[in-house]
From Swiss-Prot:
Mg(2+) 2 binds at D70. Keywords: Cytoplasm, Hydrolase, Magnesium, Metal-binding. Its cofactor is Mg(2+). The lineage of its organism: Bacteria, Pseudomonadati, Aquificota, Aquificia, Aquificales. Homohexamer. This is Inorganic pyrophosphatase. Its main location: cytoplasm. Its EC number is 3.6.1.1. Substrate binds at K29, R43, Y55, Y141. Mg(2+) 1 binds at D65, D70, D102. It comes from the Bacteria. GO terms for molecular function: inorganic diphosphate phosphatase activity; magnesium ion binding. It catalyses: diphosphate + H2O = 2 phosphate + H(+).
């Protein structure tokens, strides 16, 4: 069984699986190759920055950019690339980059994995400093890469994240396999 066989969650869109590609604290961007199912080094970040939290995607989804729905998982520890985390969405960050709309879902580990975030139901309940770190990272992590840029537009709440997941699942069912 590979990642293509993994469902989008235990009870999506509220209870999702996230395949971790990039561990918290990494200065390397890893990416799962769709054809082989192997995680490749995409690039070393040109900036002296690191991913503030674990980063991955929801399997069997397709976002507007043609890739699976991206997720940043707020967590206490780095998680190995290729691991699957059961998560709960809490919101999303709308951005644009050189290729167009680039939305990032924000999630927390399911309470059975880590109860630390069980009281956080929406992105607005995260401490302001966490939201600022996330925003700062995405605004600056591509700065030294020729021709690349990012503009953070705004934070969206839980309901928008739920709709984004539903849309990603539907897009996948319509031919994203």
């Amino acid at each position: 069984m590979g990642y293509k066989d993994l469902p989008p969650g235990k009870n999506p869109p509220e209870d999702i699986y996230v395949v971790i590609e990039i561990p918290q604290g990494s200065g390397i961007k890893y990416e799962l190759d769709k054809d082989t199912g192997v995680i490749f080094v995409d690039r070393f970040l040109f900036t002296a920055m690191y991913y503030p939290f674990n980063y991955g995607f929801i399997p069997q989804t397709l976002a507007d950019d043609g890739d699976p729905v991206d997720v940043l998982v707020i967590s206490r520890e780095p998680v190995a690339p290729g691991s699957v985390m059961r998560c709960r969405p809490i919101g999303m960050l709308e951005m644009r980059d050189e290729e167009g709309i680039d939305t990032k879902l924000i999630a927390v580990p399911h309470e059975k994995l880590d109860p630390t975030y069980s009281d956080i139901k929406t992105v607005d309940q995260l401490p302001e400093i966490i939201r600022e770190r996330i925003k700062h990272f995405f605004e600056h992590y591509k700065e030294l890469e020729p021709g690349k840029w990012v503009k953070v537009e705004n934070w969206r709440g839980l309901q928008d994240a739920i709709e984004e997941i539903k849309k990603g699942i539907e897009n996948y069912k319509k031919g994203g396999k």
